Amino acid sequence: MTKGTTSMGQRHGRTHILCRRCGRNSYHVQWERCAACAYPRASRRRYNWSVKAIKRRRTGTGRCRYLKVVNRRIANHFKTPKA
């Protein structure tokens, strides 16, 4: 078997699977470490040289269930409904 480009076509195994924390296909099976969020490390992987990547993951990109409620309450000056 040669060691160049032809041997690259022989690869069938999966190196990465879905990550529990970020949900991306970046969890390395052998190293047991996510390439995207560094799970299982407590602090998330985040570098300043990838500002675009940080913007993709930060607050406001998901469902924002609680933030929607807070914004509505701010607009109404935190008035409580009268029964």
Curated annotation (Swiss-Prot):
Chain positions of all zinc fingers (C4-type): 19-37
Q: Which residues are recorded as binding Zn(2+)?
A: 19, 22, 34, 37
Q: Which cofactors is this protein said to need?
A: Zn(2+)
Please provide one cellular component term from the Gene Ontology annotations of this protein: cytosolic large ribosomal subunit
InterPro entries per record: Ribosomal_eL37, Ribosomal_eL37/eL43, Ribosomal_eL37_CS, Ribosomal_zn-bd
Describe how the cofactor binds.
Binds 1 zinc ion per subunit.
- State the UniProt keywords alphabetically: Metal-binding, Ribonucleoprotein, Ribosomal protein, RNA-binding, rRNA-binding, Zinc, Zinc-finger
Other comments? There are two genes for L37 in L.infantum.
Describe its function. Answer: Binds to the 23S rRNA.
Family membership noted in the UniProt record: Belongs to the eukaryotic ribosomal protein eL37 family.
Q: Give the protein name, as stated in the record.
A: Large ribosomal subunit protein eL37
